[in-house]
């Protein structure tokens, strides 16, 4: 197969930052995707519906003319989130999810939830009104090995949460392990997961190939090859509760190539093409459309996009960097290397 045409995909987990950084990265996503669920971990975080609507306006202003891209918004949950804010979010029609960040788990998560029981009233309201809970599934205690954070989170927090709120729609974001994939398969229809392209393409050896590779450092961290293989099997299986979420996370080069570098891989420049590589290598290109374009909208109760895109089997070279901040470029995944599929 030399080309594939399918329903325009959506990105169900995206970071676009704000200000000049936002203007630099939004076009990459808008060229490929019809919609994206925007993560709320700005500094300060997006904790109210009013803030989310203002942020949506700033994103819309950065969409190039002629592209019909729609940002879908989320709220950042804190220990102090009010249940009434959930009602406002749901009523807005623009905010479709709220994000649980365990405090300290990832970039700009220091304002996150310190104990899950502190947000039980909020989760009850979300369950009642149908707002989706998106979860960064890692514990943060120093006694837990960084490669075990996802597994321990499932055992201590996610499993009890799903039992306590059986009608709450939950997305286990950017899963990285065979155990997480199995958790989703075994759960009810109200539990789904996003999977990133980099966790499907890379294992943890990529962080240390010939030296420290800061542009392969993300959270949750890359895992063993056995887990990567299990994730590929999950996304190509046809199970409708796995769908595309790039977790594309832009950082200036100086903050990645540093003594204490930021976590995140930037993939929006090839946000659908990298997934095509994965499905092609697995002999499952015919299942890419469901994963990228159909499963996510179905879970969120939305219609698929009306238009289509075409990918061509044609190699292209990824630039060494993209303009980002003044004299501080953005280094994308595969910088200086090639991608095997191209957006027509």
UniProtKB/Swiss-Prot annotation:
Tell me, in a sentence or two, what this protein's role is: Catalyzes the reversible cyclization of carbamoyl aspartate to dihydroorotate.
Q: What organism is this sequence from? A: Azoarcus sp. (strain BH72)
E.C. number(s) listed in UniProt: 3.5.2.3
Q: Which PANTHER family match?
A: DIHYDROOROTASE (PTHR43137:SF1)
List of residues binding substrate: 15-17, 41, 136, 219, 251, 263
Cite the binding residues for Zn(2+) 1. Answer: 13, 15, 99, 247
Pathway connected to this protein = Pyrimidine metabolism; UMP biosynthesis via de novo pathway; (S)-dihydroorotate from bicarbonate: step 3/3
> Assembly and interactions?
Homodimer.
Q: How is the cofactor bound?
A: Binds 2 Zn(2+) ions per subunit.
Reactions catalysed according to its record: (S)-dihydroorotate + H2O = N-carbamoyl-L-aspartate + H(+)
Gene Ontology BP annotations: 'de novo' pyrimidine nucleobase biosynthetic process; 'de novo' UMP biosynthetic process
Residues the record lists as binding Zn(2+) 2: 99, 136, 174
Q: Which residues carry this modification: N6-carboxylysine?
A: 99
Q: List the InterPro entries.
A: Amidohydro-rel, DHOdimr, Dihydroorotase_CS, Metal_Hydrolase
Keywords of the record, alphabetical order, are: Hydrolase, Metal-binding, Pyrimidine biosynthesis, Zinc
Q: Which residues form the active site?
A: 247
Task: Write down what this protein is called.
Answer: Dihydroorotase
One Gene Ontology cellular component annotation? Answer: cytosol
Q: Name one GO molecular function term.
A: zinc ion binding
Q: Which family does it belong to?
A: Belongs to the metallo-dependent hydrolases superfamily. DHOase family. Class II DHOase subfamily.
Essential cofactor(s): Zn(2+)
Pfam families, sorted: Amidohydro_2 (PF04909)
């Amino acid at each position: 197969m030399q080309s594939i045409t399918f329903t325009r995909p959506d990105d169900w987990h995206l970071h676009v930052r704000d200000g000049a950084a936002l203007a630099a990265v939004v076009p990459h996503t808008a060229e490929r995707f019809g919609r994206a669920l925007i993560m709320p971990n700005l500094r300060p975080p997006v904790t109210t519906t009013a803030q989310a609507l203002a942020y949506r306006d700033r994103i819309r202003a950065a969409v190039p003319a002629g592209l019909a891209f729609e940002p879908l918004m989320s709220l950042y949950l804190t220990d102090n989130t009010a249940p009434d804010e959930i009602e406002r979010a749901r009523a807005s029609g623009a905010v479709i999810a709220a994000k649980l960040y365990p405090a300290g788990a990832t970039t700009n998560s220091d304002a996150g939830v310190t104990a899950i029981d502190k947000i039980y009233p909020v989760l009850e309201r979300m369950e009642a009104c149908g707002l989706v809970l998106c979860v960064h599934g890692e514990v943060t205690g120093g006694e837990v090995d960084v490669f075990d954070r996802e597994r321990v989170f499932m055992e201590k927090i996610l499993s009890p949460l799903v039992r306590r709120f059986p009608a709450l729609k939950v997305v286990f974001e950017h899963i990285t392990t065979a155990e997480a994939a199995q958790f989703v398969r075994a759960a009810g229809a109200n539990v789904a997961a996003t999977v990133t392209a980099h966790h499907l393409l890379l294992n943890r050896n990529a962080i240390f190939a010939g030296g420290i590779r800061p542009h392969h450092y993300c959270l949750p961290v890359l895992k063993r090859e056995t887990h990567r293989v299990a994730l590929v099997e999950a996304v190509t299986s046809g199970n409708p509760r796995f769908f595309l979420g790039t977790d594309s996370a832009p950082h200036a080069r100086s903050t990645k190539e540093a003594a204490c570098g930021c976590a995140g891989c930037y993939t929006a420049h090839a946000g659908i093409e990298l997934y095509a590589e994965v499905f092609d290598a697995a002999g499952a290109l015919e299942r890419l459309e469901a994963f990228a374009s159909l499963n996510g909208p179905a879970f969120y109760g939305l219609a698929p996009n009306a238009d289509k895109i075409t990918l061509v089997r044609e190699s292209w070279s990824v630039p060494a960097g993209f303009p980002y901040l003044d004299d501080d470029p953005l280094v994308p995944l595969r910088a200086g290397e090639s991608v095997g599929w191209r957006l027509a």
